From Swiss-Prot:
Binding, Na(+): G87, T90
Subcellular location: Cell inner membrane
GO molecular function: fluoride channel activity; fluoride transmembrane transporter activity; metal ion binding
GO CC terms in record: plasma membrane
Keywords of the record: Cell inner membrane, Cell membrane, Ion channel, Ion transport, Membrane, Metal-binding, Sodium, Transmembrane, Transmembrane helix, Transport
Protein name as annotated: Fluoride-specific ion channel FluC 1
Keyword 4Fe-4S: no
Catalytic reactions of this protein: fluoride(in) = fluoride(out)
Membrane topology qualifier: Multi-pass membrane protein
């Protein structure tokens, strides 16, 4: 049986704390952005925007701090941003509920447009984040 040392347990606890803190910040940010962009019934622009910007952030940060990235980030900082913040900020569950409500409310074409535009927007956002960070990574360091 391999028992983790107290240092390993401390590192694990700190990583959990970083992810938790990122989740809190991401969740609060999502709530505030959702309030600011709430357009009422119909097409859920706030959730589309939140998931698109979250995809942009994770694509940018993953590339910026990846093996070929310009920025060296500690594992706990990557987990804070990518797992914690982006996980707390983006919301597939809200997307699912909004899509269900649109279908259930008889707005089938709006629901289909929402699903299609969301998937395209998220993928384009991750790609744009990656491209932006890749270009930044190639800049001369000062």
């Amino acid at each position: 049986m391999n028992v983790p040392s107290s240092a390993e347990r401390w590192r694990s606890a700190m990583l959990y704390a970083w992810v938790s803190a990122g989740s809190v910040v991401g969740g609060l940010t999502r709530y505030l952005v959702g309030l600011a962009l709430d357009t009422g019934p119909g097409f859920p622009f706030a959730t589309l925007f939140i998931n698109a910007t979250g995809s942009l952030i994770i694509g940018f940060y993953a590339t910026l701090t990846g093996p070929d990235g310009r920025m060296l980030a500690r594992p706990e900082h990557r987990q804070f941003v990518m797992t914690g913040f982006c996980g707390g900020y983006t919301t597939f569950s809200a997307f699912s509920l909004e899509t269900f409500r649109l279908f259930h409310g008889g707005m089938k074409y709006i629901a289909l447009a929402y699903v299609a535009s969301s998937v395209v927007c998220w993928l384009v956002s991750v790609w744009l984040g990656h491209i932006m960070a890749s270009r930044y990574n190639r800049l001369k360091r000062s």
